[in-house]
From Swiss-Prot:
PANTHER family: METHYLTETRAHYDROFOLATE:HOMOCYSTEINE METHYLTRANSFERASE RELATED (PTHR21091), UROPORPHYRINOGEN DECARBOXYLASE (PTHR21091:SF169). Substrate binds at R21, Q22, A23, G24, R25, D71, Y146, S201, H316. The lineage of its organism: Bacteria, Pseudomonadati, Pseudomonadota, Alphaproteobacteria, Rickettsiales. This is Uroporphyrinogen decarboxylase. PROSITE patterns: UROD_1, UROD_2. The record marks D71 as: Transition state stabilizer. Disulfide bonds: none annotated. One of its GO terms (biological process) is protoporphyrinogen IX biosynthetic process. The keyword Cytoplasm applies. Pathway: Porphyrin-containing compound metabolism; protoporphyrin-IX biosynthesis; coproporphyrinogen-III from 5-aminolevulinate: step 4/4.
Length: 340
């Protein structure tokens, strides 16, 4: 089963499987490599180590796609913006506050992003041909929120106040990030990625008018630009937390695949699969429970999504405390499931 076609095809009635953050802290082999590197960003730019951890979940679980080990904040970092990752705290960034701050952003990225593209090339070379390779970037809006807030996981009042009060400057920053995101994704495709994903982790914090301006419009621009060069590359979008605005997103954004968060009803996911391929949406916390619950939840999703354009995934990233044996059980449940 592969994720190589557009739209993604099913084989033997079984959906393809991969998991967000499948290369990560829940794997002991990942932690062994992580301990060898001083900081997280250095890890993201280390060609050999990033390649190794990208391949780890493929070797262990046989997922149908690998996703490059990287981070959405390598883009602003490579463009000269101050970004750091603190243990047990997360990302810390210089705050973008005024037009003057554009002087800290370079028009051309330094050689840091070249390391990312080397990782893509090396992974593609070592990955089984039948396994797809997903390149990715953060959405312009989500990357912008980190730059405006100076850190992650806030209530986003700083970002929202900024875009309400500084419409022209907010648009200028959004456009800058959008253009750089397009180049970053295209370069990943040129390096060997055959699927692209746009992570919009904070799409769900915006009201409808701002959602259109800061989520829908830049995503449309990115997709149009990529398709101009690579019309057959499938693009996955993920407007996490968008709720009812998922439908507006689907109406306006020409996405090939849409990732669904756990709060969207399965019947909606089933309905949307008539228009696009849907991906999701198991709650990651389910993998912290027991096999009985895991099997029950997986079977419910599979029964509803039978014969639909569907990729099995979580509704968000796998949690660090997830037992690897539960992930192994998830894969087993999906591959052994018998449709009625």
């Amino acid at each position: 089963m592969t994720l190589n076609s557009s739209p993604i095809k099913r084989l033997d009635n079984k959906p393809p499987i991969w998991l967000m953050r499948q290369a990560g802290r829940y794997l002991p082999e990942y932690m062994a490599v992580r301990k060898e590197v001083k900081n997280f960003l250095e890890f993201c730019y280390d060609v050999d180590k990033a390649t190794e951890v990208t391949l780890q979940p493929i070797k262990r679980f046989g997922f149908d796609a690998a996703i490059i080990f990287s981070d959405i904040l390598v883009l602003p970092h490579a463009l000269g913006w101050e970004v750091d990752f603190k243990e047990n705290i997360g990302p810390l960034l210089k705050q973008f506050k005024s037009k003057e701050d554009f002087k800290y952003l370079q028009d051309n990225s330094n050689d840091k992003l070249e390391k990312v593209y080397e990782i893509v090339k090396k992974v593609r070379k070592e990955l089984p041909k039948s396994t797809s390779l997903i390149g990715f970037a953060g959405s312009p809006w989500t990357v912008m929120t980190y730059m405006l807030e100076g850190k992650g996981k806030q209530d986003f009042r700083v970002s929202k106040k900024f875009i309400y009060e500084n419409k022209d400057l907010a648009k200028e920053l959004l456009n800058f990030i959008t253009e750089k995101t397009i180049h970053h994704l295209i370069n990943q495709i040129k390096s060997g990625a055959n699927i692209i994903k746009i992570f919009d982790s904070w799409a769900g914090i915006l009201p409808e008018e701002e959602f259109k301006k800061f989520v829908i419009e830049p995503t449309k621009k990115i997709i149009k630009s990529i398709k101009g060069y690579f019309p057959d590359i499938p693009i996955i979008t993920f407007p996490k937390g968008a709720g009812l605005l998922y439908e507006k997103f689907l109406e306006e954004v020409p996405t090939d695949i849409i990732a669904i968060d756990p709060l969207i009803p399965l019947e909606k996911m089933k309905l949307w699969s008539n228009k696009v391929t849907v991906q999701g949406n198991l709650d990651p916390v389910i993998l912290l429970t027991n096999k009985k619950i895991i099997k029950e939840k997986i079977h419910k999703i599979l029964s509803i999504m039978e014969n639909k354009n569907f990729i099995f995934n979580l509704g968000h990233g796998i949690l660090p405390e997830t037992p690897p044996e539960n992930v192994e059980f998830l894969v087993k449940c999906i591959r052994e499931y018998e449709y009625k």
